[in-house]
A protein has these predicted regions:
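Short, tandemly repeated low-complexity microdomains enriched for cysteine and small residues
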Residues: 55-60, 85-91, 144-151
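Gly/Gly-Pro-rich "capping" loops immediately C-terminal to redox-active cysteine motifs
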Residues: 8, 23-52, 58-63, 107-137, ...
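The canonical Cys-X-X-Cys-His
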Residues: 13-22, 72, 99-109, 163, ...
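Electrostatic cytochrome c docking/interface patches
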Residues: 1-11, 25-30, 77-98, 113
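Conserved hydrophobic/aromatic "anchor" residues
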Residues: 11, 47, 75-76, 97, ...
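Conserved N-terminal glycine/acidic-rich loop preference
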Residues: 79-89, 103, 107-125, 171
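C-terminal capping alpha-helices of c-type cytochrome domains
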Residues: 62-84, 126, 151-171
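N-terminal export/targeting leaders of redox proteins
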Residues: 1-2, 45, 49, 158, ...
């Protein structure tokens, strides 16, 4: 069984230096607090299998055991994301989230699901903008799609930024 306390110890020694809540220091590294366990484990496997290619994460994924990953996932899933100090989301960003029906996959309040959808609420603006741009181009899979995401394909950069700001404003 997963051990959240062991995950907390691993997080302190292996994760916290990059995955902090500071937008200024690590704006392109996601917050992990509150991410559903299934999502965390799926992303870890993607790094291990090199379907996602951040060099530090690929190396770390190879070093940690399945038990370590389960412990980390249990730890992060149990945490409440820190309040964001980011600007309030725009009405345009909210309208885009509604139009794209983000909650259908990402759950009520866009807090992720036990089925493995990521928590979008409260995520860093810059990280979310970057991720949406990669999914829009097909560089990063969105769900099971390994091609440009049709939901995001027609969004302008300004719309992507508006959506990211709105998502960051949620808690």
């Amino acid at each position: 069984p997963a051990d959240a306390a062991a995950g907390a110890r691993l997080s302190a020694s292996r994760c916290a230096s990059c995955h902090s809540s500071s937008e200024a220091i690590h704006s392109t590294v996601p917050l992990l607090e509150g991410q559903p366990k299934a999502y965390f484990i799926a992303q870890w496997r993607a790094f291990r299998e090199r379907k996602r290619t951040a060099p530090v994460m690929v190396t770390l994924a190879a070093e940690l055991s399945e038990q370590d990953v389960d412990d980390l996932a249990e730890h992060f899933a149990a945490l409440v994301p820190p309040p964001t100090a980011q600007a309030a989301g725009s009405d345009a960003g909210r309208a885009l989230a509604d139009r794209l029906r983000c909650a259908v996959c990402h759950g009520p309040g866009l807090k992720g699901t036990s089925a493995g959808a990521a928590r979008l609420a409260g995520q860093k603006v810059r990280y979310t903008t970057w991720s949406l741009q990669l999914m829009r181009s097909g560089t990063r899979p969105h769900g099971s799609a390994a091609k440009p995401d049709p939901l995001l394909a027609d969004l302008s950069n300004a719309e992507v930024e508006s959506l990211a700001a709105y998502l960051a404003s949620l808690h």
